[in-house]
């Protein structure tokens, strides 16, 4: 029996595992690909126009970095080449001593072993991952696959220059960096399990499936029962389907929070996601989604569970917007985390968890601290009786203690308690519109704000930025200011008269950016580094009764524009239509340096330091010394500054961010002259500005920063809207002015 068992085991091993004898040479081209990603600044896009061979970009990157001496890309890699590579990487002597330094050619596996040994010393070494993956298909077998694109059990990857067609329906060991497969080991397991795929339909001999986003038909001789519209695991062995395990157990409920690790479902709490979790949208045709597409506050999908985890989700309902979920920041809008929460209600209210409910009378105070045992039971929900409003006593706003319609949810987080207000969208708008636009403005102007605010809210329902905490937006200027000012009759009238109206472009909801005051012109999204052609409804135009023909990206033209005023500009009568900040060089330098490191930490890719060779790189910077010059590198459409270079006595930095430029040049203690008086601001009102050096006795003594407008300058100027209404424009005309090509849709 023992001999028989051994024989069977050996046969099975031979069937399931095949290994090509690893005597094939490993070429410089193949090695270059791995090193380009792991040890240079190479980017995938560089392969596009670098030559007629797939390896040209990789070879160029590695050669320029001096990592390998490559005469012929097809030449074999020798042990002495990897030894020289190790010395170039400055590995410790102890590591170097373990490497061979011979002219012998390396097999693939020998190179891969050395590569992994040297990986900790490569600049992108932490991004390289070695893992096992099943190969579901390539362009040779999948119509959805693009050039050099492989669908695997670990996701979709590019595999430029690698042969994968013979690995389909097999499990292999791959080396990846980002979304690129760098290499594949020769060892192959002739068995693969495709977990949580979608079976669309079947016949007696086939099943039509969607495997991780790609359609595939598998042959299954003798299928005894039809299988359709179901989640399943499918095993393939030696090229044949050997097993189908369908999954039909489901849970449903409102989604209260979503992360990459779990979904919090009302009534079930936090349920872990399976490692191979998949989500399929079968309502809008058919599409594969990710956990980031799950919308909190709604129940649009059925969750399929097995062994205590969510394996998949099927979206089968449309999003009919009713409520929005808003994180309430603490006093001063400093943080989303609260040290404690005290609240009461104008009517009786219920405090509930998944395990218990407690009723309180109107006026009773409920208090919660992070260590309260209620939070161990999950999310705590506070629900008022009909018509009741919840007052958060532990938070102060401009109006005093704020009160809220809808329900309040309290959730534990590492840094405190998160408060979420689940409220009808139209009720939300009643406390957004007067917080964003003065209620003293004409009702027609408030209608414009109402449509913009509603559109903004609809757009953010699907963005998922706060899904981890179970919300869509927060109540600060990061989104729309909510309930900083109590609701007003004029804004309520505007909201009611535009009820359900949103702004769309080609049927898609528009991200309706707006700001306080223009300088007489708007800009587009290129100021934020976005592609302006993707947002055709954000254009640069003069916010004026008279249009001009000026190229304000030209420095001289913009200076002439910003140092003059035009009474035809709709914002001409407002304080920040024009402004000027004058500062001596010492005060300006001190203020700039005091904020520099904080700004660098918030946007390290946008604050770059000049190197000895003149190039700019992202690196820690805390002080540039005394400012010696400020140079505008680029202006966006309309003249807003996109990039400046600031030279100092100790260092030179380039700032490629509108918000960082505003923050770094603002001076809390310096008076700013405005159109109507003076003020002090921690940030520049906008980057529609020029930097004029001031000299005394031939030496730089300070700067005059002359500018106009308040805000980013994209989309609608709120103050201009009020003036347009005075000119008898209606809200529809105003929306077309600021968002050309859009349409108002009724939801």
PLM feature segments, named:
Residues 20-43, 51-67, 71-120:
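Short, solvent-exposed alpha-helical surface patches in non-cytosolic proteins
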Residues 2-22, 40-46, 66-67, 91, ...:
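Conserved, single-site charged/polar hotspot
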């Amino acid at each position: 029996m023992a001999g028989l068992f051994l024989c069977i085991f050996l046969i099975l091993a031979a069937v399931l595992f095949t290994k090509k004898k690893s005597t094939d040479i490993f070429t410089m081209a193949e090695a270059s690909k791995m090193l380009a990603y792991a040890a240079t600044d190479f980017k995938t896009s560089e392969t596009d126009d670098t030559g007629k061979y797939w390896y040209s970009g990789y070879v160029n990157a590695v050669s320029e970095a001096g990592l390998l001496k490559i005469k012929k890309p097809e030449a074999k890699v020798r042990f002495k080449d990897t030894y020289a590579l190790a010395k170039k990487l400055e590995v410790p002597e102890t590591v170097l001593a373990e490497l061979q330094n011979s002219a012998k050619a390396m097999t693939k596996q020998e190179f891969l072993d050395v590569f992994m040994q040297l990986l900790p010393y490569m600049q992108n070494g932490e991004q390289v991952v070695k893992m096992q993956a099943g190969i579901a298909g390539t362009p040779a077998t999948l119509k959805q696959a693009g050039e050099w694109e492989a669908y695997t059990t670990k996701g979709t990857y590019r595999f430029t220059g690698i042969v994968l067609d013979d690995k389909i329906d097999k499990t292999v060991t791959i080396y990846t960096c980002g979304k690129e497969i760098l290499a594949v080991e020769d060892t192959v397991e002739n068995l693969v399990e495709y977990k949580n795929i979608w079976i669309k339909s079947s016949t007696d001999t086939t099943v039509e499936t969607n495997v991780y986003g790609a359609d595939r038909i598998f042959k299954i001789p003798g299928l005894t029962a039809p299988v359709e519209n179901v989640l399943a695991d499918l095993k393939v062995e030696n090229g044949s389907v050997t097993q189908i395990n369908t999954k039909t157990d489901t849970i449903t409920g409102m989604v209260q929070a979503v992360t990459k690790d779990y979904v919090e479902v009302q009534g079930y709490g936090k349920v872990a996601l399976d490692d191979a979790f998949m989500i399929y949208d079968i309502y809008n045709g058919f599409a594969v989604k990710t956990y980031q597409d799950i919308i909190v506050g709604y129940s649009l999908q059925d969750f399929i569970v097995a062994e205590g985890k969510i394996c998949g989700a099927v979206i089968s309902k449309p999003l009919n917007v009713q409520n929005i979920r808003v994180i309430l920041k603490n006093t001063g809008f400093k943080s989303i985390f609260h040290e404690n929460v005290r609240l009461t209600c104008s009517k009786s209210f219920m405090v509930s968890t998944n395990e218990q409910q407690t009723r309180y009378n109107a006026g009773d105070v409920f208090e919660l601290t992070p260590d309260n045992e209620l939070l161990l039971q999950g999310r705590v929900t506070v629900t008022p009786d009909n018509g009741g409003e919840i007052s958060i006593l532990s938070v102060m706003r401009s109006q005093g203690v704020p009160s809220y319609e809808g329900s309040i949810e309290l959730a534990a987080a590492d840094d405190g308690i998160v408060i979420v207000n689940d409220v009808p969208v139209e009720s939300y708008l009643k406390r957004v519109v007067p917080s964003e636009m003065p209620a003293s403005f004409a009702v027609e102007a408030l209608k414009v704000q109402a449509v913009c605010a509603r559109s903004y809210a609809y757009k953010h329902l699907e963005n998922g930025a706060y899904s981890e905490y179970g919300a869509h937006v927060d109540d600060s200027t990061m989104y729309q200011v909510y309930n900083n000012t109590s609701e007003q009759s004029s804004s309520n009238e505007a909201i009611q008269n535009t009820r359900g109206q949103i702004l769309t472009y080609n049927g898609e909801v528009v991200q309706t950016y707006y700001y306080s005051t223009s300088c007489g012109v708007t800009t587009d999204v290129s100021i934020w580094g976005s592609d302006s052609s993707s947002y055709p409804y954000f254009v640069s135009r003069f916010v004026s009764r008279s249009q001009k023909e000026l190229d304000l990206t030209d420095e001289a033209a913009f200076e002439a524009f910003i140092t003059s005023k035009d009474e035809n500009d709709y914002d001409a009568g407002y304080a920040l239509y024009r402004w000027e900040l004058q500062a001596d060089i010492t005060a300006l330098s001190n203020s700039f340096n005091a904020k520099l490191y904080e700004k660098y930490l918030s946007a390290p890719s946008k604050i770059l330091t000049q190197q000895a060779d003149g190039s700019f790189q992202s690196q820690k910077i805390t002080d540039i010394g005394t400012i010696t010059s400020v140079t505008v590198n680029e202006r966006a459409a309309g003249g807003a500054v996109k990039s400046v270079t600031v030279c100092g006595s100790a260092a030179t930095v380039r700032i490629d961010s509108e918000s960082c430029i505003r923050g770094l040049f603002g001076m809390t203690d310096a008076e700013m002259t405005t159109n109507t008086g003076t003020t002090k601001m921690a940030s520049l009102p906008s980057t529609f500005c020029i930097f004029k050096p001031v000299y005394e006795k031939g030496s730089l003594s300070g700067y005059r920063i002359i500018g106009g407008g308040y805000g980013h300058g994209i989309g609608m100027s709120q103050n201009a809207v009020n003036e347009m209404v005075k000119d008898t424009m209606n809200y529809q005309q105003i929306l077309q002015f600021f968002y050309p090509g859009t349409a108002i849709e009724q939801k």
